[in-house]
C-alpha cells in the first residue's frame, strides 16, 4: 500500500490557481494570451486531463466574468495588478470636451420650430367618440371595408365628362376584364355603287 501512494502523482491544483500562477510566471506587461497560459501550465504540470483546452477556456471565461481577470486585446491581466488597464464599457467612448470652451446655450422649445417627421393628423371629434365607444369591443376579423369617398375629398376642379363609348351606347359602368376589340365598319356593296 505504501508503494501505491508513493507512485501516485500529486494531484494538480485547481485551474484558477494554475491560471493566476501562469499569468504571474509569464509576467508580461501586455498581458498573457490563452495559448501562452496553456503552454506554461503544460510545462509546469505535466499530467493534465485530456480536456485541458476546453477546461482552460471555460475557467478563463468564468474568471473574466467574475472580475478576477481583465481581458483586453486578446490578453488576460490580473484584476488587481497596477499595470492592468482600466475596464472600459462597450461602444464608442464619448468625445473629450474642451474645458475652456463655453457651455452651449440651452435651446428654448419655441426656437426649435417644427419637430422632426410628419406632423400629426388632426383628430375629428367623431373619430374620437367612435374610438372611445368601441374600446371594449373585440376587433372584427379580416380586412376592413373601404371608406366611401366624400365630397370634401373630391378635387376642386370638376373632372371632364367621360367620352362616349365607341359602339354608341350610353357610357356606364365598365365590365370586368379587357374590352372587346372595336372592329372597323365593313363597307357594304350598296354603299360603293
From Swiss-Prot:
Subcellular location: Nucleus, Nucleolus
Entry annotated with the keyword ATP-binding: no
Motif extent (Nuclear localization signal 1 (NLS)): 86-92
Motif (Nuclear localization signal 2 (NLS)): 145-149
Superkingdom to which the source organism belongs: Eukaryota
Gene Ontology molecular functions: double-stranded DNA binding; nucleosomal DNA binding; sequence-specific DNA binding
Segments for region (Disordered): 75-193
H15 domain segment(s): 11-81
Keyword set, alphabetical order: Acetylation, DNA-binding, Nucleus, Phosphoprotein, Repeat
Single GO biological process annotation from the record: regulation of DNA-templated transcription
DNA-binding region: 87-98, 113-124, 138-149, 173-184
CC terms in the record's Gene Ontology section: nucleolus; nucleosome; nucleus
PTM (free text): Phosphorylated by CDK, this phosphorylation prevents DNA-binding. Motility is increased when hypophosphorylated.
Gene3D superfamilies, per database record: Winged helix-like DNA-binding domain superfamily/Winged helix DNA-binding domain
Its job: Binds A/T-rich DNA (e.g. present in the storage gamma-zein gene promoter) with a highly dynamic distribution into the nucleus. Probably involved in endosperm development, during cells shift from a mitotic cycle to endoreduplication leading to massive synthesis of storage proteins (zeins) and starch.
Family named by the database record: Belongs to the histone H1/H5 family.
Note: Confers resistance to nickel NiSO(4) when expressed in yeast (e.g. S.cerevisiae) by counterbalancing nickel impact on cell cycle associated with an increased chromatin condensation.
Name of this chain's protein: HMG-Y-related protein A
Annotated source species: Zea mays
